[in-house]
């Protein structure tokens, strides 16, 4: 028996599928690339693309007052937790607050590893040492750092009154970006938060770079600097091994101008750890500022 399918039915079905796909895409775009705060676009000559930033101002923001600045990677990820933690910290401090700027990854282009992986490691991250055959593109964290230093920071300084307290925060690949900036442009920030960083890239190359920096650049810390490290106790064994190596590097290379803290959150997996770490990092940084002359 022949089955007859109405052409209008097929057309309507196709339109329904397309409409549903567009709704899903729009929802994903909104969740990823639109924030609950102030969204601004910057035409970056360094990156040769337009980048968006999310700006969270303090609830009692006063344009005549100066504020500390926090820059975080990964845009909306964990942003609600940051808002909650900053609000709670401000209540404890009697109103002192910071401006938080989150940089989302691009939506239609895969930019996360490109921007956050250091230039001495492969974009397609690997546990083994890289081969010098020129076939595997490096990360471009150096360009992303340039964007922050020569485009984003001047833009923010032109719009807001900022003091000298600056924090850079990142999670996972973003944590490795934090460590990259820490050992290549130390003076750019006086606070660094690296949640579950990935120093295992290319046979622990991030650990090696940090170790070499600490051993050979004793004078690099021209100002008191704070570093917060954390990892989840139930993360991948390779992550925990690399984290332990990183801890040992800091333990054996003391510097009077560097205060670093490390927390291992029991029973926490990779995506749990940053949620548990934000308040601790902010509290540690504030204690550091209180002790700094």
Q: What would you call each of these model-derived segments?
A:
Residues 12-26:
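Hydrophobic membrane-insertion alpha-helices, especially the h-region
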Residues 1-6:
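N-terminal secretory signal peptides that target proteins for export/translocation
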Residues 26-293:
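Non-catalytic cap/lid and distal C-terminal segments of serine-dependent acyl enzymes
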Residues 7-9, 13, 292:
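N-terminal cationic leader/targeting segments used for protein routing and processing
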